Amino acid sequence: MAKDIKFNIDARDELKKGVDELANAVKVTLGPKGRNVIIEKKFGAPHITKDGVTVAKEVELADAFQNTGAQLVKSVASKTGDDAGDGTTTATVLAQSIVGVGLKNVTAGANPMDLKRGIDKAVAKVVESIKSQAEMVGDNYDKIEQVAAVSANNDPTIGKLIADAMRKVSKDGVITIEEAKGTDTTIGVVEGMQFDRGYLSAYFVTDTEKMECVMEHPYILIYDKKISNLKDFLPILEPAVQSGRPLLVIAEDVDSEALTTLVVNRLRSQLKICAVKAPGFGDRRKAMLEDIAVLTGGIVISEEKGLKLEQATLEMLGTCDKVTVSKDNTTIVNGAGAKENIQERINQIKAEIKNTTSDYDKEKLQERLAKLSGGVAVLYVGAASEVEMKEKKDRVDDALCATRAAIEEGIVPGGGVAYIRASEALEGLKGDNEDETTGIEIIKRAIEEPLRQIVANAGKEGAVVVQKVREGKGDFGYNARTDVYENLHAAGVVDPAKVTRVALENAASIAGMFLTTECVIVEKKEDKPEMPMGAPGMGGMGGMM
């Protein structure tokens, strides 16, 4: 396949055109007065969104050189979204500014490597300042609500929903987003630990109306192999039955012979018993059984530990306040495990989350963490039309991610003010040479850009507002939603520090690569010959009877 190659200023100019095309489409969504972008879909209604990364993902340019530039900035937006969950539009605006001003200087003869060094120096200083401005959220759910509301494009109802969901399942809990059947947005909470395995036989059901097996204060037997013959099972079954308490059996599987015996006993002697399969597969199954054991204060009966089923005693069984088993799910509420053991297990899973690189593993570990630390909340997003539903779901997702980032690294004043305050840290900062100092000035100018854009989207003059905010101190800034200058912290206009930091770091990283690019290679478009026309005279079959 033949390639097209461009060098120096030609290459950089084409890349910049692509950057501008993408950034101009994305930046109109920034801030409380951000505009909508309508995206045509091949099938169904067009998608209306204010989510920067959704817009960025849709941009594909016809010119290969320009498209390369656009794709690079798209990667800034995506990476910021992945790392911090929000701030995609801010990162795009910052990248556009650094690239734009930087290229002017490179064209005027500045050394790109020195510019990059200056940019990196300035970014390090700004990041330091952002960290020092950050205020930890702790257990203050009012602040959590503010962050969520701002990220959901200033929708206080979404902010309240997310804060309520976090109250119910703790900050470590898993919160998932699903589409509601009606127009209302509501929260559903599954308390305790739930896993997706139901009863092995419908004869275990105690509540025939709901088709559920409900047990109060049951013993819980956790076994990591298949229960195939009853002989091994009887030594633990008999004392459990004599105690008069129900018994929940969690095992890899229960053979038909053993299952039949359990069912017959259940029906004849009203033996309160239920058997379910263990959740998960392979190593994940072992880990989940261990989680259940820690939560209920029991032990996993496993031959790996030198324990056989016939050696099991009542002391090895877990217990809890209540178990509900349906056709598809088992829920364990208020396990009797020791608090410190559960906390230790939670810390262990958190450490695994930090160390894993796979998104899939991270998601699964996060689920396990939630099940141990309080439960799972589901936000059911409702809207009047499918188009509105998609747009609202985007915003709820943004808000949820931003809230998690705020819990991690704290909050800073929103509305681009954190960057303006951070620029004070650049006063008097000099590079080792003139070009490095220019690099520092590029960042100083770029970090004003988010505020300028927020103001421009609100229909005001950016330069005037930036000057006024710069004259203020601390949390003083411009609230674009209400069009007043005030203490943004008090007004609830706050951003997660992590989002602010990650957006700048990623933007500067890609922009630095741009400035030091000397050659771009793309695939040459081949002109395909047009399809030949059909043979003449085939238009009709005239004259045939």
From Swiss-Prot:
It is found in: Cytoplasm. One of its GO terms (biological process) is protein refolding. It catalyses: ATP + H2O + a folded polypeptide = ADP + phosphate + an unfolded polypeptide. GO terms for molecular function: ATP binding; ATP-dependent protein folding chaperone; isomerase activity; unfolded protein binding. ATP binds at T29, L30, G31, P32, K50, D86, G87, T88, T89, T90, G415, D495. Keywords: ATP-binding, Chaperone, Cytoplasm, Isomerase, Nucleotide-binding. Its main location: cytoplasm. One of its GO terms (cellular component) is cytoplasm. The keyword Transferase does not apply. Its EC number is 5.6.1.7. Belongs to the chaperonin (HSP60) family. Together with its co-chaperonin GroES, plays an essential role in assisting protein folding. The GroEL-GroES system forms a nano-cage that allows encapsulation of the non-native substrate proteins and provides a physical environment optimized to promote and accelerate protein folding. Forms a cylinder of 14 subunits composed of two heptameric rings stacked back-to-back. Interacts with the co-chaperonin GroES. HAMAP family: CH60. This is Chaperonin GroEL. The gene is groEL.
